[in-house]
Swiss-Prot record:
<keyword id="KW-0150">Chloroplast</keyword>
<protein>
    <recommendedName>
        <fullName>Photosystem II reaction center protein H</fullName>
    </recommendedName>
</protein>
<dbReference type="GO" id="GO:0042301">
    <property type="term" value="F:phosphate ion binding"/>
</dbReference>
<keyword id="KW-0604">Photosystem II</keyword>
<dbReference type="GO" id="GO:0015979">
    <property type="term" value="P:photosynthesis"/>
</dbReference>
<dbReference type="GO" id="GO:0009535">
    <property type="term" value="C:chloroplast thylakoid membrane"/>
</dbReference>
<dbReference type="GO" id="GO:0009523">
    <property type="term" value="C:photosystem II"/>
</dbReference>
<feature type="modified residue" description="Phosphothreonine">
    <location>
        <position position="3"/>
    </location>
</feature>
<keyword id="KW-0597">Phosphoprotein</keyword>
<dbReference type="InterPro" id="IPR036863">
    <property type="entry name" value="PSII_PsbH_sf"/>
</dbReference>
<keyword id="KW-0472">Membrane</keyword>
<comment type="function">
    <text>One of the components of the core complex of photosystem II (PSII), required for its stability and/or assembly. PSII is a light-driven water:plastoquinone oxidoreductase that uses light energy to abstract electrons from H(2)O, generating O(2) and a proton gradient subsequently used for ATP formation. It consists of a core antenna complex that captures photons, and an electron transfer chain that converts photonic excitation into a charge separation.</text>
</comment>
<keyword id="KW-0793">Thylakoid</keyword>
<keyword id="KW-0812">Transmembrane</keyword>
<feature type="transmembrane region" description="Helical">
    <location>
        <begin position="41"/>
        <end position="61"/>
    </location>
</feature>
<keyword id="KW-1133">Transmembrane helix</keyword>
<dbReference type="GO" id="GO:0050821">
    <property type="term" value="P:protein stabilization"/>
</dbReference>
Amino acid sequence: MATKIFDDALRAKPKQSGLGVFLKPLNSEYGRVAPGWGTTPLMGFFMALFAIFLVIILEIYNSSVLLDGLSISW
């Protein structure tokens, strides 16, 4: 009997939500690759900025950067 209930559950149609209907057009290009480099240089630029940000945070945390007028005491 448990198998019968499980089989019936697999045949049920999925419910559509308002959010799903709204987001479906965003997923219509799934699996397609745009020709050329696309936005790769922009992504690389922001990755470099993020890496610089992380280095600055790390240097402040390690107290290897001395900031004028700001004393950090843990």
